[in-house]
Amino acid sequence: MRCSHNVNIGQRQPRKRPLQQQQQHQLQQQTRAGSRSVNSRISVAQRVLAVPTDYGRSPARDCGHFPLYHVRRKLIDGR
């Protein structure tokens, strides 16, 4: 599988909503985007469902995009 860890670098990740609120928000966005093309709605769904990088998974360590994995882990966790 191609490494996709650098895909979302540079795009500010939106603050994660609680799940219920997120689903409501998605519905609102879809009804608002209803007049637009199907493609825009799909991209909205992709943006909503985009998962921020999980530093705990091994691919992040293995793919070479995170050479300072443990340092970053410490910074993120505050340990």
UniProtKB/Swiss-Prot annotation:
Residues 19-30 have a biased composition (Low complexity). Residues 1-40 are annotated as: Disordered. Residues 1-10, 31-40 have a biased composition (Polar residues). It comes from the Viruses. This is Protein B5. It comes from Human herpesvirus 6B (strain Z29) (HHV-6 variant B).
